[in-house]
């Protein structure tokens, strides 16, 4: 059978999901294999070293470096508070006084009789990694992280902003073609993940943030609306660290793009359930897609279901595969592959390429270069 390979997005009504939760540095894992966790359960902890601050003790006190030990009132390893004296100089029966204070809360790490300086290091900063999704711990990676498994609906988006968030799904649009505008967002949207149709406006994003919504899932967004909302023009190579207070996942891409019917139906059927969403996007090496995970009741034998791990992306394209066209003149339209001719074909650009024949949802059959489609995994 003729087959080709192309990038794709996953849309699953129900599958076993495995998420790896890793510490940025070695630390302590506080759950075991078999443990059941909620989305908020802390599964791993670590501490990063605090920042060092150099204090010019001798210069401040007006003494020679080799005298520093004599006048230090705090020793190596001692805790200090910001503004607390770490060294004091007294002369002429106390008539001449000079003090050196700590610039931060922290610990005296060292002081030198060569440089006349002390190093105060701020307290370690704790790092807590939560489970993100409710489920069961199926693997522990010693000192590094865990793998959590859950049964869920799963949707990968094309672009997103904002980090991990959670909220109850609420339909804010009636059809996949509706535009999500500010007048559709009410006070009862607080804490919710709102589902729009083809597009969301900047006013709607601002209104959602104002009422306390946790996220927005929509087909597309105009670049100017995104810039208006963020206050600056974003680079799309790596996102997810924006401090917006709202996570956005565009399931189809930029512009006004109807959300795929299947995607809209999945979200519609799961209205009222909690969604775990992440807008992080990376289009460079090590591709990261924004995602929506909706934990659902597990069937009797969930272990028999196919497991969807984060690194899996088959890329297989064959007759019957559901794809979306990502270039004009059929940009945004979707359908099933009806043939994959092996012979090279001439296209309008006068280049010679391999093509794919797609039967669009409208019933029309079109031929486009294989590079101009992406898989929507069903």
Please tell me what each predicted stretch does.
Residues 1-378:
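Well-ordered secondary-structure scaffolds
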């Amino acid at each position: 059978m003729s087959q080709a390979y192309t990038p794709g997005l996953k849309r699953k009504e129900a599958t076993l999901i495995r998420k790896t939760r890793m510490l940025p540095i070695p630390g302590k894992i506080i759950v075991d294999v078999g443990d059941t966790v909620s989305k908020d359960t802390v599964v791993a902890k670590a501490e990063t070293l605090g920042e060092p601050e150099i204090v010019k003790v001798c210069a401040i006190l007006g003494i020679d470096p080799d005298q520093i030990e004599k006048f230090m009132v705090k020793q190596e390893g001692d805790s200090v508070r910001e503004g607390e004296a770490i060294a004091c100089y007294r002369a002429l029966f106390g008539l001449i006084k000079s003090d050196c204070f700590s610039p931060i809360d922290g610990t005296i790490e060292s002081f030198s009789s060569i440089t006349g300086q002390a190093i105060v290091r701020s307290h370690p900063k704790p790092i807590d990694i939560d489970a993100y999704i409710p489920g069961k711990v199926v693997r522990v990676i010693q000192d590094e992280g865990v793998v959590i498994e859950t049964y869920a609906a799963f949707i990968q988006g094309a672009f997103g902003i904002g980090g991990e968030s959670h909220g109850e799904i609420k339909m804010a649009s009636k059809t996949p073609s509706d535009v999500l505008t500010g007048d559709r967002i009410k006070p009862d949207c607080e804490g919710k993940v709102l589902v729009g149709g083809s597009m969301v406006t900047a006013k709607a994003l601002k209104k959602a943030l104002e009422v306390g919504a946790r996220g927005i899932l929509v087909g597309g967004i105009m670049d100017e609306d995104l810039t208006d909302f963020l206050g600056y023009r974003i680079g799309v190579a790596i996102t997810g660290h924006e401090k917006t207070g709202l996570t956005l996942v565009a399931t189809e891409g930029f512009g006004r793009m109807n959300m795929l019917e299947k995607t809209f139906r999945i979200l519609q059927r799961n209205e009222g359930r909690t969604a775990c969403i992440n807008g992080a996007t990376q289009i460079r090496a090590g591709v990261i897609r924004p995602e929506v995970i909706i934990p659902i009741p597990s069937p009797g034998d969930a272990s028999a279901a196919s497991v969807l791990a984060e690194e899996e992306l088959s890329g297989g394209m064959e007759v019957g595969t559901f794809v979306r066209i990502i270039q004009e003149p059929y940009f945004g339209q979707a359908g099933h592959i009806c043939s994959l001719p092996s012979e090279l074909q001439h296209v309008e650009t006068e280049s010679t390429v391999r093509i794919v024949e797609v039967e669009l949802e409208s019933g029309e059959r079109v031929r486009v270069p294989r590079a101009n489609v992406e898989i929507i995994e069903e």
